[in-house]
């Protein structure tokens, strides 16, 4: 309630432990189902959305049952959790790049963090492959701000890793545009380049449906129809 009074339109709930904090494990349940339900109901009462950081099987299921709009990370997801998401329309924001980025710099980051990132990496990808196979809806997100996970280059790596999980380039692009806008309740203005919506778009030299690495160079970014970045 306090965060929403301050202007938050999405409430993120820490349903489980994580990789970046010492003294906890990704599988640790940090909020039980009743606690999650109380927060989700408050967000939805205001017409806002609720997301759950959930990296363990039990925490994921608690989050889905509580009615969150999305589950971030979804590591250690099993078939039951995937089917629950599919039945309830819960969206996954994979953030595959977050532990990947940590694992690229093992010599400069805290040992506890690197150890956990290495432990979850394979399970993270396996969970996304399961979700893709089941047909769970995805919305692209990077968890930017975690170590070596920046706002400039992480998106391309995330797109490539989502493709590695079994999504087609078209599905990946849909997750990064239409699906993200729908999840955040901004699809009236964003997510598609159509009449009546904001002219936010990227012009590329190459076709991303052929190679998603097209986003990594030779691009022009337009915001509300105005060029704001060129490489």
Region locations from a protein language model:
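Histidine/acidic residue-rich metal-binding segments in metalloenzymes
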Residues: 1-92, 118-138, 188
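Active-site loop ensemble at the mouth of alpha/beta enzyme cores that anchors a bound cofactor
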Residues: 95, 99-116
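His/Asp/Glu-enriched, well-ordered alpha-helical/loop segment
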Residues: 45-49, 109-112, 121-207
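Catalytic metal-binding/acid-base residues of hydrolase active sites
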Residues: 55, 97, 145
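Short aromatic-centered micro-motifs
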Residues: 221
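Small/polar (Gly/Ser/Thr/Ala-rich) solvent-exposed segments
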Residues: 210
